[in-house]
Amino acid sequence: MGMNRRTFLSYLATLSALPLLPASFAYAFDRIAGRFGPVPEPSDIQRVISAGPPADLLLLALAPEKLLGFSSFDLSGETGALFSETVRRLPRLGRLSGRASTLSLEKLLTLNPDIIIDCGSADETYRSLAQRTSQQTGVPYVLVDGGLQDTPTQLRQVGQLLNVTTRAGLQAQFADAILQRANAYRTNAQTEKPRFYFARGAMGLETGLRGSLHTEAVELLGFENVATAGELKTLTQVSMEHILRWNPDLIITQDVQSYQNITHSEQWQSVQAVAQQRVILMSGLPFGWLDAPPGLNRLLGLCRLQSHFDPVAAQQLKSDTRTFFHLFYHTDLDDAQLELLLRVA
């Protein structure tokens, strides 16, 4: 059955007893990296445009009633079966990303938004794009730094911006608890910290380099990313020669085709992780658990990945998943949906 009010309140009571970070600490670092144009008062913001995939999920969590549509996701079909009808009706509008934009400025203006919000990388490229878009359209643009460790602060600060502080506070509290549990696992000298390769793409030969947003969730548990390239922290293409040389003892993928290729292709069989059947597939959502996008969806992916190695996390996984969907996706999962979502490959 889904999560009823009594179960949810009981869970929150337990959650409130955890040694959470104080609010003053959470606000010590401003995760709103840039404000371009005159930002309206919170009570005046009713129509919000998401600039990209991480912002899609941030705004779905905080203010689905103000979100005009997704930049990148279409949940109207079978892929959106886990979500409410209201969420499934949100259109895919296209993303704002400079020359690669799929949402034109002309269409943007016809939507009459009060504000544009982006979340993720906040480097000079994205700041310049935000400033230019705001100047060209007259629509205020807010850029949020999207580091996973900073998710609670992102939620509180953008929640304040959108006048949804109560909802944001509950979400931030749960995010704090997930991150603290992951940090405790990482700092425990007795826990397993495998050397991992994060396989992307149909052939499994795309990956995120160590320190990138794309592998941040896995690295947060203290796992060692075998893919490194000096100071680069991006996605990259690799070869089988790279993988054979790195010889990871764990492979993680979110792509079913990649999983099939890795586990059945002869060239992968000499990789230690494959030989020892330590290839984890995390699929079942219309977006990734640990990446694609590198947004707050990674919190739940963190819970699920930790459950493979931590018996306590494994015991809490179903409860965590129900609570996450309730708080962030505004959906109460039934037992069948939960089992399907968490099926193990």
Predicted segments, located by residue:
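A short, structured surface patch at a secondary-structure boundary
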Residues: 55-110, 115-124, 226
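A ligand-binding cleft/hinge motif common to bilobed small-molecule-binding domains
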Residues: 123-134, 253-269
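Ligand-binding pocket segment of bilobal, Venus flytrap-like solute-binding proteins
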Residues: 227, 234-258
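Short helix-initiation/N-cap motifs at beta->coil->alpha
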Residues: 34, 93-105, 231-240
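Alpha-helical, coiled-coil/dimerization segments enriched in small aliphatic residues
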Residues: 207-234
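C-terminal segment of N-terminal export signals and the immediately downstream linker at the start
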Residues: 2-3, 22-40, 48
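Extracytoplasmic substrate-binding proteins
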Residues: 29-32, 38, 115, 127-206, ...
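N-terminal export signals
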Residues: 7-28
